[in-house]
From Swiss-Prot:
Covalent S-S links between cysteines: 53-72, 54-70, 60-73
Reported tissue expression: Expressed by the venom duct.
Cellular localisation: Secreted
Propeptide residues, chain positions: 20-49
Domain of life: Eukaryota
Name of this chain's protein: Conotoxin CnIIIE
Species this protein is from: Conus consors
């Protein structure tokens, strides 16, 4: 029984329980905030929402927060 206790102690020292992700550490899904981050033609008049493309006079490709939003020119 003491061997099992030693093994358990070694395992807990090498891999503590705090290393496991807890529910409080995970991000919460917030669909309302995602909708605010969405690119819309109201915010960007050169953006054509149907084609996901930029209109004339826009520089391409266009990125928003390191995400490609317009690739056709």
């Amino acid at each position: 029984m003491s061997k099992l206790g030693v093994l358990l102690t070694i395992c807990l020292l090498l891999f503590p329980l705090t290393a496991l992700p807890m529910d409080g550490d995970q991000s919460v899904d917030r669909p309302a905030e995602r909708m605010q981050d969405d690119i819309s033609s109201e915010q960007y008049p050169l953006f054509n929402q149907k084609r996901r493309c930029c209109g004339e006079g826009a520089s391409c490709p266009v990125y928003s927060r390191d995400r490609l939003i317009c690739s056709c020119c």
